[in-house]
Amino acid sequence: MSTINQLVRNPRKKKVIKSGVPALDSCPQKRGVCTRVYTTTPKKPNSALRKVARVRLTNANEVTTYIGGEGHNLQEHSVILIRGGRVKDLPGVRYHTVRGALDTTGVDSRMQGRSKYGTKKPKK
């Protein structure tokens, strides 16, 4: 235990909490323009072709974002909305695209978990 004099000379340091999504600047979402849309492979032991996009945000940051769901319409110069949330098996991917917002279409033929993929309720 420290004495009062020791604490006066050298106070206790606050723990610095590092953000998992620094490019969002404490915002829930950010808008950006796709600079490159491509597929990449996950790390071991998984195997797939994951769809990702390189995005230049409105605050001039450039980040890699994951495009969830089956199929997408994104290409270079598409304007998209991104949110936080990393992809565990893709190193360096800390953001997700928001489906159904701006230039991104929702996932067609999606029946469950529709709100996460920007799909409208099907007509009866």
From Swiss-Prot:
Membrane-spanning residues: none
Annotated region described as Disordered, given as residue ranges: 105-124
Modified residues (3-methylthioaspartic acid): 89
UniProt keyword list: Methylation, Ribonucleoprotein, Ribosomal protein, RNA-binding, rRNA-binding, tRNA-binding
Any single GO CC term annotated in Swiss-Prot or TrEMBL for this entry: small ribosomal subunit
Pfam family, one: Ribosom_S12_S23
GO biological process: translation
GO MF term set: rRNA binding; structural constituent of ribosome; tRNA binding
Entry-linked Gene3D superfamilies: Nucleic acid-binding proteins
CDD domains: Ribosomal_S12
Subunit field text: Part of the 30S ribosomal subunit. Contacts proteins S8 and S17. May interact with IF1 in the 30S initiation complex.
Membership in a protein family: Belongs to the universal ribosomal protein uS12 family.
Job description of the protein: With S4 and S5 plays an important role in translational accuracy. Interacts with and stabilizes bases of the 16S rRNA that are involved in tRNA selection in the A site and with the mRNA backbone. Located at the interface of the 30S and 50S subunits, it traverses the body of the 30S subunit contacting proteins on the other side and probably holding the rRNA structure together. The combined cluster of proteins S8, S12 and S17 appears to hold together the shoulder and platform of the 30S subunit.
HAMAP family tied to this protein: Ribosomal_uS12_B (MF_00403_B)
UniProt name for this protein: Small ribosomal subunit protein uS12
Organism of this sequence: Vesicomyosocius okutanii subsp. Calyptogena okutanii (strain HA)
